């Protein structure tokens, strides 16, 4: 299998390492490739949209014609994992906790409402333990950096994991979104779960 | 995509050990001010949260701004963060006098108008400018040689803060000392406000050379190096294992064009700071967009070419040849 990581900006290297760790845990043979051009999108069986700045990733991906390409592929069933900025990119409804609605290029394929910078600024970034039983894992420590929150889901989008008053991981068919950073965690459970979606 | 042998979690475990070491030292009274970050869950301001933040800046461009209008231009161009200053480095150089942190009112205005992270600079060793910015809630503090140093001998002990710090460095020793003091991100010092990339290139090459030399040394000589750099041996070992700095390293100082940005990425930097280069040019909107495009796509000369075509060389800022600066006019030598 070939898994692509959108690699303009953000935690793309960390996702690549984590995907490789997850592959070796599951005894899968596969490759991780950087996605930067429309032609890269044709090569992959699944795609990760990393954490970073969603405005930056959106602006560059749109400029290079990758945004539309990915959107069409996701609509056709390409498995996708969006973390933090990636979750923002996937959401149909995005606003900022302080600044409100701002226009930015998005993929917008997932029936989730996301609020950017929900917990506040970097000072309010935190780490905590989450329970991953619902996807076959145990407790694992994860980090939330200037994290968004998933306020609600509709249609067949469902909440997988909640924390305090919001959803931090959601799923809809081929799409997975997390507001925390599984790529910086010791546990590879989220990436293992994502790879299992590609296998199907 | 560059891949390393260690995951973020493994690097992080090491930094927790370093932070514990700092705690032990301060508990024994060797440091005057002792850090106390409560570790209940969910935990804010942890080493993990501080080191994670710069990871999400990688591949991006951080732009110096002096007001809301400039900050909005930066955000719309795709900057990953802005650095709020009172004066751009070019103007600091021209105006002389003591350069201090920016007006908190302006920083606050910028924070309320854009969604990307907002950073600000403090003078080297100025704990209280840093405390003020932490209280204000900026996302990252730059302890910067571009401002006039407040302490000629010491840098801030950054383990004490919940807000992550970025520090400048010209070589591996400087970088490791700042990391040991708790910096979460390093940037090359370059020579700010000159529009001349040569010093940033020099510093990045020195860093690369010193890292590759370190890797080739036998263990006993690495011990010696750790003493020379005045850092724990474990930190030197971590660099050897990773074959790079253990935290995010950006290029800064003199970057003025998309090709400059791509050059610094090619030399191994994780991202770019652009100071005077954008808002001292005559085409800031286009130039900001072009530099962002080039930094993210540095492996592809055709895209860098496209970015370079978006700007016009006769609108670039007038550069200053480093050789024409007097030794006392150099900013990079402040705070080693």
Swiss-Prot record, chain A:
Q: Which UniProt keywords apply?
A: Glutamine amidotransferase, Hydrolase, Lyase, Pyridoxal phosphate
PROSITE patterns linked to this entry: PDXT_SNO_1, PDXT_SNO_2
EC no. given is: 4.3.3.6, 3.5.1.2
Q: Which Pfam families match?
A: SNO (PF01174)
Which top-level group of life is the source organism from?
Answer: Archaea
Family per similarity comment = Belongs to the glutaminase PdxT/SNO family.
Stated name of the protein = Pyridoxal 5'-phosphate synthase subunit PdxT
Organism, scientific name: Sulfolobus acidocaldarius (strain ATCC 33909 / DSM 639 / JCM 8929 / NBRC 15157 / NCIMB 11770)
Name the lineage: Archaea, Thermoproteota, Thermoprotei, Sulfolobales, Sulfolobaceae
UniProtKB/Swiss-Prot annotation, chain B:
Residues of the active site are: 121
- Cite the entry's keywords alphabetically: Lyase, Pyridoxal phosphate, Schiff base
What Enzyme Commission number(s) apply to this enzyme? 4.3.3.6
Q: Which PROSITE patterns match?
A: PDXS_SNZ_1, PDXS_SNZ_2
Q: Which Gene3D superfamilies match?
A: Aldolase class I
* UniProt GO molecular function: pyridoxal 5'-phosphate synthase (glutamine hydrolysing) activity
What reaction gets catalysed by this protein?
Answer: aldehydo-D-ribose 5-phosphate + D-glyceraldehyde 3-phosphate + L-glutamine = pyridoxal 5'-phosphate + L-glutamate + phosphate + 3 H2O + H(+)
Tell me the pathway. Answer: Cofactor biosynthesis; pyridoxal 5'-phosphate biosynthesis
Q: What does this protein do?
A: Catalyzes the formation of pyridoxal 5'-phosphate from ribose 5-phosphate (RBP), glyceraldehyde 3-phosphate (G3P) and ammonia. The ammonia is provided by the PdxT subunit. Can also use ribulose 5-phosphate and dihydroxyacetone phosphate as substrates, resulting from enzyme-catalyzed isomerization of RBP and G3P, respectively.
Family to which the UniProt record says this protein belongs: Belongs to the PdxS/SNZ family.
Task: Indicate what this protein is called per its UniProt record.
Answer: Pyridoxal 5'-phosphate synthase subunit PdxS
Natural source organism: Sulfolobus acidocaldarius (strain ATCC 33909 / DSM 639 / JCM 8929 / NBRC 15157 / NCIMB 11770)
């Amino acid at each position: 299998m070939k898994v692509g990581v959108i690699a303009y900006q953000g935690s793309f290297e960390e996702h690549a390492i984590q995907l490789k760790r997850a592959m070796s845990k599951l005894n899968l043979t596969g490759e991780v490739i950087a996605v930067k051009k429309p032609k890269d999108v044709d090569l992959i069986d699944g795609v990760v949209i990393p954490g970073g700045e969603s405005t930056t990733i959106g602006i560059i991906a749109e400029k290079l014609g990758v945004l539309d390409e990915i959107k069409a592929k996701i609509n056709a069933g390409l498995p996708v994992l969006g973390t933090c900025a990636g979750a923002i990119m996937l959401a149909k409804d995005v606003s900022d906790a302080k600044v409100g609605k701002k226009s930015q290029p998005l993929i917008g394929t997932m029936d989730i409402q996301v609020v950017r910078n929900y917990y506040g600024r970097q000072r309010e970034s935190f780490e905590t333990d989450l329970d991953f039983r619902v996807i076959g894992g145990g407790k694992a420590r994860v980090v939330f950096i200037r994290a968004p929150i998933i306020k609600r889901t509709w249609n067949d989008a469902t909440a997988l994991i909640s924390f305090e008053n919001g959803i931090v991981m959601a799923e809809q068919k081929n799409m997975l979104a997390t507001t925390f950073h599984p790529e910086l965690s010791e546990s590879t459970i989220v990436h293992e779960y994502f790879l299992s979606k590609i296998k199907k | 995509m560059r891949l390393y042998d260690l995951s973020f979690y493994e690097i992080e475990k090491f930094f927790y050990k370093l932070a514990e070491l700092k705690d032990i030292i301060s508990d024994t009274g060797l440091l005057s001010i002792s850090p106390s970050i409560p570790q209940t869950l969910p935990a804010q301001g942890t080493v993990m949260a501080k080191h994670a933040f710069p990871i999400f800046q990688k591949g991006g461009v951080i732009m110096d701004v002096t007001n809301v209008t400039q900050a909005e231009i930066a955000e719309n161009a795709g900057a990953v963060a802005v650095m709020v200053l009172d004066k751009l480095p070019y103007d600091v150089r021209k105006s002389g006098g003591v350069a201090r942190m920016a007006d908190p009112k302006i920083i606050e205005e910028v924070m309320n108008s854009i969604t990307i992270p907002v950073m600000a600079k403090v003078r080297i060793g100025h704990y209280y400018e840093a405390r003020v910015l932490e209280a204000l809630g900026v996302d990252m503090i730059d302890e910067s040689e571009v401002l006039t140093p407040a302490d000629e001998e010491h840098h801030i002990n950054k383990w004490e803060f919940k807000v992550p710090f970025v520090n400048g460095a010209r070589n591996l020793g400087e970088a490791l000392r700042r990391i040991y003091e708790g910096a979460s991100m390093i940037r090359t010092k370059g020579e700010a406000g000159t529009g001349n990339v040569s010093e940033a290139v020099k510093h990045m090459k020195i860093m690369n050379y010193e890292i590759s030399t370190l890797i080739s040394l036998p263990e006993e000589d690495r011990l010696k190096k750790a003493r020379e750099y005045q850092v724990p041996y474990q930190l030197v070992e971590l660099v050897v294992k990773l074959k790079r700095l253990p935290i995010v390293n950006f290029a800064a100082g003199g970057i003025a064009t998309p090709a400059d940005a791509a050059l610094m990425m090619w030399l191994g930097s994780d991202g770019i700071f652009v100071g005077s280069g954008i808002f001292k040019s005559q085409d800031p909107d286009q130039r900001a967009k072009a530099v962002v495009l080039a930094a993210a796509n540095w492996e592809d000369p055709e895209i860098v070419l496209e970015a370079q075509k978006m700007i016009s060389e006769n609108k670039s800022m007038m550069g200053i040849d480093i050789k024409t600066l007097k030794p006392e006019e150099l900013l990079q030598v402040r705070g080693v």
